[in-house]
Amino acid sequence: MLVNIIFLDYERHDFTQQVKNHNFSNAGYDFSFTQVEMKGISRALNYGISRSKAFDAIVTMANDILMPDSWLLRMVEAALNIPNTGMCGIHCVEGINPLQTINGIQIHPQDASFGNVLIPMAAIEKIGYFNEAYDPYGMQDSDYAFRLKMTGHINYYLHDLRSEHIGHDVGQDTPYRKMKDEGLSKCDYLWARETQKYHDNNDYTIFLNEYP
């Protein structure tokens, strides 16, 4: 499995080098990477996807999450053994569901997997790109996970692994935090609007013109 990491590095670079040094050295599996400094999480991920067509999977990676040893090896093993993998993640934030075993792989199935996730290109080819309506910051990961689930994919965390979010900035008076708060304030409205649109049209795909 050929993997391309889409490394999101917009605006705040406090932990960029630390995260790259750590996550790139302990992955346990070969990879390529595309570093994107672009406003809007969906827009940045979509640009990365457009540069990943020769790969079998992507990994979405934030510049403030540290991954455990052999994280990519474990992700690849899971995706190869669970053919309908949507988002394969390593638990970082939010809750985690009970353990299940699928094809010998221990996982925690989720509605959405947050943090850094592996997404097979086969899943991307089925549902397309991230929804840029949530940009610059919002529920783009939940939206993508919802569309994956509705098209027969399974989103999950790997068992017995934990990643660490080192970029906590809640309450900070910075332009970056203000951008996030503004995006989050629109989440409920956008989520209701976009998911209703998918249901009404019975269409969970988003295909965009290729990025230059």
Residue ranges and their predicted role:
Residues 101-121:
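A recurrent flexible, glycine/aromatic-enriched loop bordering the glycosyltransferase active site
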Residues 70-102:
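Conserved donor NDP-sugar-binding/catalytic core segment of glycosyltransferases
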Residues 1-18:
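N-proximal low-complexity "stem/linker" segments adjacent to membrane-targeting elements
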Residues 36-52:
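Glycine-rich, basic loop-to-helix element that forms the pyrophosphate-binding segment
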Residues 55-66:
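Short beta-strand-to-loop acidic/aromatic patch adjacent to the donor-nucleotide binding site
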Residues 19-29:
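Short, acidic, metal-binding catalytic loop of nucleotide-sugar glycosyltransferases
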Residues 137-212:
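C-terminal catalytic/acceptor-binding lobe
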Residues 119-138, 147-153:
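Aromatic-glycine-rich donor-binding/catalytic loop that engages nucleotide-sugar donors
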